[in-house]
């Protein structure tokens, strides 16, 4: 079955979408404990821009409180806990390169 162009185009646009993020990548100082689940679903910007010089960038953010289970392997204890995760609320296509930086990827040295 062929997916219609307009559907493909709309789904690929720069927008917030549910994304799985690792708890340890988002909270790298928490490596002594085990978390369940080990990743959580949050809204993050992703998608394509109409111009390769642009990238899908968050222009609105908020902090989401998400309940997880923290387990301590040393004491064999566990508890429910609320952790904070950044969620994107709005996205825009913005220039890839900041003003003052060379346009384009840096040359390897």
Swiss-Prot record:
Origin organism lineage: Eukaryota, Metazoa, Chordata, Craniata, Vertebrata
Role: Snake venom VEGFs may contribute to venom dispersion and prey subjugation by inducing vascular permeability and hypotension. This protein stimulates vascular endothelial cell proliferation (EC(50)=0.2 nM) in a similar manner than VR-1 and vammin. This angiogenesis probably occurs through VEGF receptor (KDR/VEGFR-2) signaling. Also induces drastic hypotension mediated by nitric oxide (NO), which is produced by VEGF-activated endothelium NO synthase. Also induces vascular permeability.
Quaternary structure note: Homodimer; disulfide-linked.
Gene Ontology molecular function: any one: chemoattractant activity
GO cellular component: extracellular space; membrane
PROSITE patterns: PDGF_1, PDGF_2
Family classification: Belongs to the PDGF/VEGF growth factor family. Snake venom VEGF subfamily.
Residues with the Pyrrolidone carboxylic acid (Glu) modification: 1
Annotated S-S bridges: 14-56, 45-91, 49-93
Tissue: Expressed by the venom gland.
Biological process per Gene Ontology, one example term: sprouting angiogenesis
Keyword Lipid biosynthesis: no
Superkingdom assignment: Eukaryota
SMART domains linked to this entry: PDGF (SM00141)
Pfam families on file: PDGF
Places the protein is found: Secreted
Entries under Gene3D superfamilies matching the protein: Cystine-knot cytokines
Official protein name in the record: Snake venom vascular endothelial growth factor toxin VR-1'
Additional record remark: The new subtype VEGF-F is proposed to group snake venom VEGFs that specifically bind to KDR/VEGFR-2.
Keywords associated with the record: Disulfide bond, Growth factor, Pyrrolidone carboxylic acid, Secreted, Toxin
Organism, scientific name: Daboia siamensis (Eastern Russel's viper)
